[in-house]
From Swiss-Prot:
The keyword Repeat applies. WD repeats lie at residues 138-177, 358-397, 401-440, 487-528, 531-570, 633-671, 719-766, 769-809, 825-866. SUPFAM superfamilies: EF-hand, WD40 repeat-like. The lineage of its organism: Eukaryota, Metazoa, Chordata, Craniata, Vertebrata. This is Cilia- and flagella-associated protein 337. Residues 695-711 have a biased composition (Polar residues). PANTHER family: WD REPEAT-CONTAINING PROTEIN 49 (PTHR44324:SF1), WD40 REPEAT DOMAIN 95 (PTHR44324). Associates with components of the nexin-dynein regulatory complex (N-DRC) and the CFAP184:CFAP263 complex. It comes from the Eukaryota. Keywords: Cell projection, Repeat, WD repeat. Gene3D superfamilies: YVTN repeat-like/Quinoprotein amine dehydrogenase. Its main location: other. It holds the Pfam family WD40. The keyword tRNA-binding does not apply.
Length: 1049
């Protein structure tokens, strides 16, 4: 069945073919490949007909067809095609020549054919490149290595003089560190190579002093050397690092030196420690530990062992790498003997087994494709050769086309293509299957003849780095034109929802703002060039949702109406370009947060981290900012902010700090961080405040990791792990200050979501929402029932947080809330999220860098894209989630119980002695187990009575009405016509006046008072037997009551 479904899904976009043999107009998905074969022209409807032909009325019975039966039935059932064509299809399916085929064989062949066509299509796609760009580097010497850190989405470059540069995800230079000490500079030592040890958050740097230093990225200091490996016999000039993704403790660091020696350190407990610390070592964790190479060779360190060989015999090792699929170390030199050496170790032997490739004139570099099992070599003889690792005699393919020696090669793994770069600055892209050059790029590279080139292709982001001495060039791939619908021409940056107009507002990097109808997806209007050519980074709506505020990278915020008229321009950057991250509109001010602008000319930081605009200044078009009284309390760029009425403001930054502010006084009073906490002293405070931790260098929590609580955490770690990208208050959770529980949610670095209690300054919960994708963003609905998170790969996850972290606890919760839905509506980074409820239906709106805006529901709803040809109708396609129906039922039950309580509380007009008597009698029927709760019940009853004794007539009517609200009152029936009675038609006949007659006098009765002789009493009125029986009954009742009282005592 899986094969059947797969075939139908793969060809879902095809059209039904005509029912005539002349099939001339049927356009299917397969015709895009330019093939006219029968199997490529069958549509979904044709496959459904063929499937029914193979179905048996008896369950679990497989129908097989011979060649004659198949050709005869197919021409009749499908309705087009010749018997010869179906016979050829039968022969292709019947590879084993059994003489018959069934449905499973047919679908397996079709799936394999589709897969091969898809692979061929990918291989022939030629990437389109943007213009060549040179990055503004600060390196003064040759760039030795470019690496990408997946954990933090940062690039690192290092140059020969030892300057390490840190680049952001968007290739903005953030910081530089001199990695060499003063003593090293005096010796004129150079950096030769750099590798990233991602599983342990370290980097290794090789020096010409025959040393390899290991630097901890999580160090409290700016850049601390943790291990120093010295005593090597030769200078290492190339390195490579590999770790097992299934067991991160297993890793291998390999390096080659100028003596032709290839060495490798195999770590067995990398997550615990790379090397064993001797007992005599200093207890200070930040002190550098020195390891001698001789110690490793002797086996003193049990957590690692050494592998090495000398087959290159004195030639410089230009490149070395360990490949897990081959389980071998591959190295290369520029010599024509032993140009490429593969070394591996068998389990029963200690020495390495080796095999070598002899390539004429040697090679400069190589690369290995594990799926194709090919080694590509960059030959000095202008040729690119493809080698089978197990065939050393000759290459399996030779790529001709370069007119100069090839200095770099690298596979485009996903497309099965190969890059090659030659000495004459010509870049070629090869189709491996056909061994043809499909693209030649000769950009305006630097014209210097003598240069050292570094080649690095980041396939995940489509970026190609080529260095020329100390210059770094970038070639970025253009996003390929796909069949996916685009909402904007450029990447979408922000999305908002206007609940009054029921419209979605979106912005992009091209300074365009678009308006969409949420009900149908139709575009209403569009504003272009809102900030010239500058990117719109964020937007906001005012409280009345009648004004739109747009923030741009040009350092301004503009206030618009919905007719496209700009009323004010807020000069945030003070005539300078700054990155605005968020606009927060409060009651009496507008806050703008963002990144500080660094002026490289003056080497100073310009601008404020928080900018405030007050309404009294809004009488002009250009409005200048005022001073934020709290000053700059963050140590890093502010990325987000949130406000909780009446006066709580929070801001989050790159280093993971969340600062709590008093919005009225504009003073900061506390700092939250996952690893430590500290208090900030306000300007208006006269008494010094006690710090929760003695500076930022000491953790406040006793269980805090010592490696993550530094004075100034290394920026890569803080941005990758704790960066706060979004903040959100859970405003629907009332009285959290009394009941406890989380009322603030933050998310960001490394895919973590954290729940905070700002009143107790406590981190209550932390869970990993998205793993291995870097930073994430989030949004929640107004009732705080659902939390939506989005990552850099376009994935969305919807979580149920209605019952999550409602109470405070001593231990931090690490269990994630219930995951309702996980899907991928976008192909690129999700830039903005918004949750709305038009018409009571909860919707999630997401925008992405793939130029699209999507809208969907909570539970398995379809995904619509704004801009698609077919409009939708939300009310006909979405339903409330099941969780909501349960909530409605529970609310109904709650209402019923409340109504019953209200009915038990009588109205003040209905109180009487009888009611008092009933209440007094009810106290004798109390169960023994409920005697303890009498006081509580009395208070509840009195409270209920107080509530009912409100002197409002409306309240009485409301409660009396609630008594009959369960009755089904229908429309009254129409009365039939009634004939008027005779006395109405002729009243004089029946009501005429009679003549008055004289009334007879009534005689008065004689008075009893005069004739009464004696007074009656009970003794004379009732018989004696009845009175005697009554006296005995009273005595018996009194005796019983006395006995009850004695028993109680």
């Amino acid at each position: 069945m899986s094969c059947q479904k797969a075939v139908l899904e793969l060809n879902i976009g095809s059209q039904l073919g005509p029912k005539s043999p002349e099939r001339t107009e049927g356009v299917t998905a397969f015709e895009d490949y330019g093939t006219g074969l029968l199997e490529n022209q069958l549509s979904v409807g044709d496959f459904v007909k063929i499937q029914k032909a193979f179905e048996s009325p008896q369950p679990r019975k497989i129908i097989c067809m011979s060649r004659e039966d198949f050709t005869q039935k197919m021409t009749e059932i499908v309705g087009w095609g010749t018997k010869e064509e179906y016979g050829e299809l039968f022969d292709k399916v019947d590879v084993a020549q059994d003489g018959f085929i069934n449905w499973d064989k047919l679908t397996s062949f079709i799936l394999l054919e589709l897969y091969e066509q898809d692979e061929r299509a990918k291989a022939t796609v030629v990437p389109q490149w943007k213009d060549l760009e040179f990055l503004p580097v600060k390196h003064k010497d040759t760039i030795q290595k470019v690496i990408f850190l997946k954990n933090s989405s940062h690039y690192l470059t290092i140059s020969k003089e030892g300057l390490l540069a840190i680049w952001g995800e968007h290739l903005k230079l953030q910081e530089t560190f001199p990695i060499t000490s003063d003593a090293t500079k005096l010796k004129h030592l150079w950096v030769t190579s750099l590798v990233s040890l991602e599983n342990v958050n370290k980097i290794a740097v090789a020096f010409t002093s025959k040393e390899v230093c290991f630097y901890d990225l999580l160090s409290k200091e700016e850049f601390a050397c943790q291990y120093k490996l010295q005593g090597l016999k030769g200078t290492p000039i190339c390195m490579d690092y590999w770790y097992d993704p299934l067991d991160a403790n297993e890793s291998i660091l390999s390096f080659g030196d100028i003596t032709g020696k290839v060495q490798a350190i195999a770590f067995t407990a990398a997550l615990i420690s790379l090397f064993e610390r001797p007992a005599s070592a200093c207890e200070d964790g930040e002190a550098t530990m020195t390891i001698n190479w001789a110690e490793l060779l002797s086996g003193c360190h049990k957590c690692c062992h050494i592998l090495e060989h000398k087959l290159h015999q004195g030639d410089w090792v230009r490149q070395v790498t360990y490949n897990a699929s081959l389980d071998a170390i591959i190295s290369s030199t520029t010599s024509n003997t032993n140009s490429v050496v593969m070394a591996w170790r068998e389990k029963s032997k200690k020495r390495l087994n080796m095999t070598s490739f002899n390539i004429a004139q040697g090679i400069h570099a190589f690369d290995y494709h594990s799926r194709l099992n090919l080694i590509a070599t960059a030959g000095i003889n202008n040729k690119v050769c493809l080698w089978n690792p197990y065939v050393v005699s000759k290459p399996v393919g030779v790529l001709w086309g370069h007119s100069a020696s090839v200095i770099a090669v690298q596979f485009f793994v996903e497309r099965k293509q190969l890059f090659s770069f030659s000495k004459d600055k010509v870049l070629r892209l090869w189709d491996i299957q056909h061994q043809l050059s499909i693209q030649r790029i000769a950009c305006s590279f630097p014209k210097s003849q003598d240069f050292r080139c570094l080649f690095h292709f980041d396939e995940a982001h489509g970026r190609l780095f080529i260095s020329f001495n100390n210059q770094l060039a970038l070639l970025a791939m253009k996003s390929e034109a796909s069949k996916r619908v685009k909402s904007h021409e450029k990447a979408v940056t922000c999305v908002l929802y206007n609940s009054i107009l029921k419209q979605v507002i979106s912005s992009d990097t091209g300074s365009t703002v678009s308006f969409w109808m949420i009900d149908t997806g139709q575009k209403i209007k569009q504003f272009t060039g809102c900030h010239g050519n500058a990117e719109i980074s964020t937007m906001a709506l005012d409280a009345n949702e009648t004004r739109l505020l747009t923030g741009s990278t040009d350092g301004t915020v503009k206030i618009w109406d919905f007719n496209g008229y700009c009323h004010h321009t807020l000069n945030v950057g003070q005539d300078g370009a700054v990155d605005i991250s968020q606009i927060l509109i409060l009651k009496k001010k507008i806050l703008v947060t963002g990144w500080e602008r660094y002026d490289y000319a003056s080497w100073k930081t310009i601008g404020r981290a928080i900018t405030v605009f007050r309404p009294q200044n809004f009488n002009q078009f250009f409005i200048q900012p005022e001073e934020w009284k709290g000053g700059i309390q963050h140590h890093d760029d502010i990325l987000c902010a949130a406000f909780l009425p009446p006066q709580t403001l929070v801001t989050g930054s790159y280093d993971g700090e969340i600062v709590l502010w008093n919005n009225s006084t504009e003073n900061a009073h506390h700092v939250l961080h996952p690893d430590y906490q500290r208090l900030l002293k306000s300007k208006l405070d006269t008494k010094p405040q006690k710090l929760l931790s003695a500076g930022r260098s000491q953790p406040s929590h006793p269980m805090a990791d010592h490696s993550t609580t530094g004075v100034r955490n290394f920026e890569i770690d803080t941005e990758g792990k704790n960066a706060v990208m979004r903040l959100c208050f859970l405003k629907a959770r009332k009285n959290t200050a009394v009941t406890g529980g989380a009322n603030l949610v933050s998310c960001g670095g490394s895919g973590y979501v954290r729940f905070w209690d700002i009143y107790k300054k406590q981190l209550l919960a932390e869970f990993l929402a998205h793993s291995g994708v870097g930073s994430i963003i989030m949004s929640t609905d107004k009732m705080n029932r659902y939390l939506t998170t989005g990552d850099l790969d376009g994935w969305l996850k919807i979580w149920n947080i209605e019952e999550y972290c409602l109470n405070s606890s001593k231990n931090k919760i690490t269990k994630a809330p219930t995951l309702i839905r996980s899907f991928q509506p976008h192909e690129d980074r999700i830039s903005s999220l918004e949750m709305c409820e038009p018409g009571g239906q909860l919707l999630i709106i997401s925008s992405s860098a793939d130029c699209s805006i999507c809208v969907t529901g909570v539970c398995n709803a379809p995904v619509w894209i704004f801009g698609q040809a077919k409009h939708w109708h939300i009310e006909n396609c979405l339903f409330l989630p099941k969780r909501d129906t349960n909530l409605v039922e529970s609310e109904i039950q709650k209402e019923i119980s409340l109504f019953s309580k209200e009915e038990s509380c009588l109205d003040p007009t209905e109180h009487s002695l009888l009611n008092k008597k009933n209440k007094d009698d009810s106290t004798y029927n109390v169960r023994p187990s409920e005697d303890i709760n009498l006081d509580i019940k009395y208070k509840e009853r009195s409270t209920c009575m107080k509530e009912t004794q409100k002197p409002y007539y409306g309240e009485v009517i409301k409660k009396s009405f609630s008594t009959f609200r369960s009755l089904n009152i229908g429309a009254l029936e129409e009365l039939p016509e009634v004939n008027k009675p005779a006395f109405l038609l002729d009243p004089e006949k029946y009501f005429r006046k009679e003549p008055e007659e004289e009334r007879p006098q009534i005689l008065e009765a004689p008075s009893l008072f005069k004739t009464l002789k004696a007074v009656f009493d009970e003794k004379n009125l009732f018989p004696k037997e009845i009175l005697h029986h009554e006296r005995k009954a009273k005595q018996l009742c009194q005796e019983k009551s006395c006995e009850v009282k004695k028993n109680k005592k």
